[in-house]
């Protein structure tokens, strides 16, 4: 996206249902920037900001119950992103407007908050998401078949095919053992077009109070070394875009290290961790990235 003051916003989206545990989304993004068509846009510029976030792109098949006592889920908290367009601001705002109407009716007329979900399904947001519902799951068949099906679904039928594809598995179930997948050799950053995680995290303005409790919880502290490292070559070292997780050797013993102060709260670890051993919880108030641009 081209913005004012000669600024360019550049992003890269990778589905978290990838199979190769050696893959690093951060390094794939760096490699993407070296493509001639991308490089010519950013060459000669200065990197001024960085961020990362897990997107909810499951569509209506992944929508949870959107109401509960005293609260409503709106926007990306619910999952209103239009995956084919990679756009969600408009749907998020509309869901917020519907939520506001529902809350007003609840306070003035004592109407149950559950009406929010019905109002949402009657809105243009749900219609838009419904028409896009089959795009994401179709790519589980592979890139070529996914593109062909999406063309038929979106161009010929405009999202009105008489069936809905299902998501076959959770993202964390997609990883295959490390010894079954090819290793990926990523080039070292040149600090001109490509950069490392440490300097990138600095640009997020991430701040956490010293000595606060670690907000990334391990259900079993021994599992990363005894299971995940052995089977998947500890993919947390790569799927985390902020360098939070490391395997270090201390006194000839391998140790799983959590650099929680680097966390930019993308929540990828909570989603992609194959053992589901990592749980992201809310850090102390005010902690996290502070995007200055």
Describe the residue ranges of each PLM region.
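Conserved FAD/dinucleotide-binding core of flavoprotein oxidoreductases
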Residues: 1-51, 90, 109, 117
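FAD-binding beta-loop-beta segment adjacent to the flavin cofactor pocket
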Residues: 52-83, 200-215, 223-239, 246
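Iron-sulfur cluster-binding cysteine motifs and their immediate structural context
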Residues: 230-260, 268-290
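C-terminal auxiliary extensions adjacent to catalytic cores
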Residues: 139-192
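Extended, hydrophobic alpha-helical segments in both membrane/secreted and soluble proteins
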Residues: 67, 73-80, 89-103, 112, ...
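Active-site-proximal substrate-binding core of FAD-dependent oxidoreductases
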Residues: 79-85, 97, 101-144, 257-259, ...
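Extended, non-globular alpha-helical segments
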Residues: 50-69, 138-151, 284, 288
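Flexible loop/turn segments at secondary-structure boundaries
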Residues: 7, 17-19, 59, 80-82, ...
